[in-house]
Curated annotation (Swiss-Prot):
Species assigned in the record: Homo sapiens
Signal sequence segment: none
SUPFAM superfamilies with a match to the protein in the record: Mitochondrial carrier
Protein family per UniProt: Belongs to the mitochondrial carrier (TC 2.A.29) family.
Gene expressing this chain: SLC25A40
Name this protein carries in UniProt: Mitochondrial glutathione transporter SLC25A40
Amino acid sequence: MDPETRGQEIIKVTPLQQMLASCTGAILTSVIVTPLDVVKIRLQAQNNPLPKGKCFVYSNGLMDHLCVCEEGGNKLWYKKPGNFQGTLDAFFKIIRNEGIKSLWSGLPPTLVMAVPATVIYFTCYDQLSALLRSKLGENETCIPIVAGIVARFGAVTVISPLELIRTKMQSKKFSYVELHRFVSKKVSEDGWISLWRGWAPTVLRDVPFSAMYWYNYEILKKWLCEKSGLYEPTFMINFTSGALSGSFAAVATLPFDVVKTQKQTQLWTYESHKISMPLHMSTWIIMKNIVAKNGFSGLFSGLIPRLIKIAPACAIMISTYEFGKAFFQKQNVRRQQY
């Protein structure tokens, strides 16, 4: 895409239209990627049954959500028996025995957090990019890095307390009155900063991921357009650029993902047993403990499952988002012409 066309697109696509495009992309990404994680959780629960109070991470392709296992026998979706022999076998048996809707078990509650976070993130990124381009010039290579960092930092900061509250409601079955009491008590005892517990490892993972993702995405998209002799990227160019840049960022930030998951799980283990969280459980201490116990490779455990989840999620999200913006841009041009 040439600079002039890119500049026109930013001007002609309104923030509301960017929000609609990102919302559509978020929902579509969740619908396509969630079944992969549902099957993974069902297979894990079959091999290692989840007792009450046990934490597990559920992903809808946009965000990771910590869930706390409840009592309920075989009624709960992640505890249903299946006798699965593998991933494909699990897909077919879940559809045949439980209905195709079971592949999206647990999705609606997670969208309450994921969709607003994604809308904030993508809209802020585009708005910041447009602002920086107007100040620094169209070809400034640091723009995707700066915009990606600021947008992700803001989205994580806004959503972090809401995610803590959502998980507490899910694990303790609080009413809104009880939730208000819990939040008030927590703030009075530990201060407002306690609502952002778990924020640091999330920022350490998501902010570098965002910077690397957007920088590589813009570079790859431009390079593929030049190789194809195109001024504007096609759907497949956006899709490929998103998958490759997402995969690279996922590998580079995996150690922080491992730490974040472990810290979340430990937090709720302490919470469920009503034990005070040790003050020394910082991100760096957890990382050192992982290396001491499992070696340096322990920081890269779960690489393949993360890539299987991240690559398609990034590809679907960005290509849908760019397609939506292109659609709105054409509609805006037509309105100006008539």
